[in-house]
Amino acid sequence: MNLELFTELAGGLDHPEGIALGPDGLVYAGGEAGQIYAIAPDGTVEQIASTGGFMYGVVTDGDGNIYGCDFGRAQVSRISGSGAIQRYSNGTPDHPFRVPNFAAFDDDGNLYVTDSGGWADDDGLVYRVAPGGSTVVWSHEVPRFPNGCCLSAEGDWLYVIESRGRCISRIAIGDDGSAGPPEVAVELPGCQPDGIALAEDGTMFVGCYRPDRIYRIPPGGQPEILAEDPDGVVLNQPTNVAFVGPELDRLAVSSLGGWSVMVADVGAIGLALRYPKVGW
């Protein structure tokens, strides 16, 4: 099942769900007690903050701030490199965050945030948080537990995992920033997809909460199982994936069910991330 591809980058983390590469070359991950971890290339781990919540997806800006989807506090928390914690957004007055799950920046510093809602309620939302924290509901049309997300290379599509929909949907981003009608890009029956990362050639890599599986989906092609762990030892609820390293040539995988971040050479180069200067 290709598990031999994977080695441990770092261990001793508290059930990391989200993972992201920062502009400083460090890998950032969250923990189930609200921890924010910084992982050096040699695997050294430093806990730089804890919100006391439950950290899901994480993303960084061009100034080294970390934005964590804090399920425990129902907010997006902004954490500076020194560990100072601020509330960046808690949704809108009419639609406060319930399950902020993952986030992705565009070039202008707008942060797209998925809120999964209730598992069986199909009431998930996607928010758009402008630089500084002003927040609107951007789309309510991918309601089936929206989860991991990322922007296309050109920044004109937002790809969203719908975990309960067993699919990857995509939403066109208009010139004015508005959301177009969604369309299903890839069906993933028989699993619970969670996180997504794009390679520079458009290949999608998808981590699944159930079963312990990672998919590779070539452009215009069918999903292929890259790796699967029937014992949940190497890949233990591999919820999120991110390309890391100076050349973006290794795929890092978080383990919500365990304590480690694994990495593998999967024969692909990651799409360069956006690190906007957000200010605040």
Language-model features, listed with the residues they occupy:
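Anionic-ligand binding region
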Residues: 159-160, 164-196
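A short beta-strand motif characteristic of beta-propeller blades
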Residues: 3-10, 43-49, 85-94, 134-140, ...
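Beta-rich, blade/repeat-based domains predominating
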Residues: 10-24, 33, 51-67, 75, ...
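Structural signature of WD-repeat beta-propellers
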Residues: 31, 40, 71, 80, ...
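Beta-propeller domains
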Residues: 28-47
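Structural recognition of the beta-propeller blade-terminating site
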Residues: 40, 79-80, 130, 172, ...
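A short loop-to-beta-strand structural motif that recurs across blades of beta-propeller domains
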Residues: 35-37, 75-77, 124-127, 167-169, ...
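Short loop/turn segments immediately following beta-strands, especially the blade-tip
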Residues: 171-177, 265-274
